[in-house]
Amino acid sequence: MSVLRASAAVFCHAGDFVGPLDFALHAGECRTLVFARGRDASIAARLCAAIVKPTHGALYIGHFDTRLQPPQAKRLVGFVDVAGLRGSRHAFACEVAFRAEVWGLDVARAQLRARETLAAIGDVRDPYARALALALVPEVKLLVFDQPGHPRYRARAAEIAPETAIVETSVVASRLVVPRDFAAVRS
C-alpha cells in the first residue's frame, strides 16, 4: 500500500498554479519535488502534508483522501516548515508537550523522544533540526520537508525512521544565459 499517492493533484488559487503532482510513495521511499519558485515548493509541500487541499485531482495519505478526510490524513504526517522552529529550549519543550497532548501521546515519552531525535540530528540550536525533531515525535508514516537547506536532514530522518516515507521540496532557479557580446551581434 502506498503511503502517499498523488493523482493529477493540482493547486490553483489567486495566480498560484502548482502541479500536476502524479506519483506514489511507499514506506521507506524518498522523493524530491523540484520547483522554480520557493512559493511553489512550499505549496507542494503543504499539499503533500494535507495542510492545503488540491483544487483538482486527488491526493491520498494512506487510505485517506486529503480533500475529504484531512484530520485523519494529518495524523499520519510529520511536516517540517522551511522556517524551522525558533525559540528557546523551554519553548521547544512546551511545543513538544502541546503536540503530545494533541496527538494523545505520553508527554514524558514525547519529551524523551524529541531530545533523543534532536541529539541524533546533531545540532540542537538549528531551527530546522528542531522542526524535524518535533515532526518525528509521533511515529508518522510520512515526513514532508519544505525546502530543507541541506541533504543531511533527509539522510538523518531516514536513519532515525527508516520505515517512514519522505517527500522534500527543492528550488532550482533556471537562468537564461545571455552571451556578453549579444548586443554586438550584427544583423
Regions found by a protein language model. Give the residues of each.
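ABC transporter nucleotide-binding domains
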Residues: I43, Q72-G78
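GG-anchored amphipathic helix commonly corresponding to the ABC/SMC/Rad50 NBD signature/C-loop
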Residues: A120-V144
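Conserved ABC transporter NBD signature motif
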Residues: G57-D65, A73
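Q-loop/switch helix immediately C-terminal to the Walker
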Residues: L76-F79, A83, S88-D106, R113-T117
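Helix-to-loop junction immediately C-terminal to a conserved catalytic motif
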Residues: A49
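Conserved beta-strand
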Residues: A6-A9, D16-H26, R31, G57
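Walker A (P-loop) ATP-phosphate-binding motif of ABC ATPase nucleotide-binding domains
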Residues: C30-D40
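Conserved catalytic loops of ABC-family nucleotide-binding domains
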Residues: E139-K141, H150-L176
